């Protein structure tokens, strides 16, 4: 499956994440809050909360922050109700884009997302216009470092992974959404740490874009990722060689 090129430069990726760490933690905290309100504060009985906590750990969110978010959502301190919405549309060159939002104000979110699409040379479409181009999959990204490829591959496949890929700096483990938690926990039990661990939408194919369109599309991505309501942005753009997304 495509969509993994962003891991070609681990240090650049980590640097970008460090710069946005506060915003990333806030967004993950919102996911934790929604998970607790839906299924309670007990990790063992709430798979959505387990997934959110795994995502938090992969982003190096301190355990104190994680526990504080869980306690706040479980108590009376957080009365905000968030709605989950997925917006779909197109970027430059017909790139397919899906935007996952958690919001307490649909009108605000719709306006902000539409504006980001327009400013980035694209347009927001109707529900379902690009969703069929993606598959929902669990994805676990592990930095290679000194790890043995065959050993990690066997661990992943034995745990129930669908696919294992070795890229320049990372191993990428792909699972079905249903098996994601089981595979993630099996790899965690082996002492592995993750750069990323989440259920996401992965494109079936990629759309190549030139440098001019890449600049426009990067503007769209930056606007969306800076929006407090936007949790995730998925797309099928293939950036030009050497482009640092």
Curated annotation (Swiss-Prot):
Keywords: Cytoplasm, DNA-binding, Transcription, Transcription regulation. InterPro entries: Integrase-like_N, TACO1_YebC-like_2nd/3rd_dom, TACO1_YebC_N, Transcrip_reg_TACO1-like, Transcrip_reg_TACO1-like_dom3, YebC-like. One of its GO terms (molecular function) is DNA binding. Signal peptide: none annotated. NCBIfam families: PRK00110.1, PRK12378.1, YebC/PmpR family DNA-binding transcriptional regulator. This is Probable transcriptional regulatory protein CPE1954. One of its GO terms (biological process) is regulation of DNA-templated transcription. Gene3D superfamilies: 1.10.10.200, 3.30.70.980.
């Amino acid at each position: 499956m495509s969509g993994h090129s962003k891991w070609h430069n681990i240090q650049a990726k980590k640097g970008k994440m460090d710069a946005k760490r506060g915003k990333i933690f806030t967004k993950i905290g919102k996911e934790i809050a929604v998970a607790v309100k839906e299924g309670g504060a007990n990790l063992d009985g709430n798979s959505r909360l387990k997934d959110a906590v795994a995502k938090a750990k992969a982003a190096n969110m301190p355990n104190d922050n994680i526990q504080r978010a869980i306690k706040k959502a479980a108590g009376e301190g957080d009365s905000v109700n968030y709605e989950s919405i997925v917006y779909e549309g197109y970027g430059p060159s017909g790139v397919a884009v899906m935007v996952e939002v958690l919001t307490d104000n649909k009108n605000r979110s719709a306006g902000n997302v539409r504006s980001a699409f327009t400013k980035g040379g694209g347009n927001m479409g109707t529900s379902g216009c690009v969703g069929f181009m993606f598959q929902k999959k669990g994805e676990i990204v592990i930095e290679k470092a000194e790890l043995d490829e065959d050993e990690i591959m066997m661990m992943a496949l034995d745990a129930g992974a669908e696919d294992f890929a070795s890229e320049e700096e990372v191993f990428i483990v792909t699972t079905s959404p249903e098996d994601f938690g089981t595979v993630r926990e099996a790899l965690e039990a082996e002492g592995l740490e993750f750069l990323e661990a989440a259920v996401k939408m992965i494109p079936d194919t990629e759309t190549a874009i030139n440098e001019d369109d890449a600049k426009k599309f990067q503007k769209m991505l930056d606007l969306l990722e800076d929006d407090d309501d936007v949790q995730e942005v998925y797309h099928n753009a293939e950036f030009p060689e050497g482009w640092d997304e």
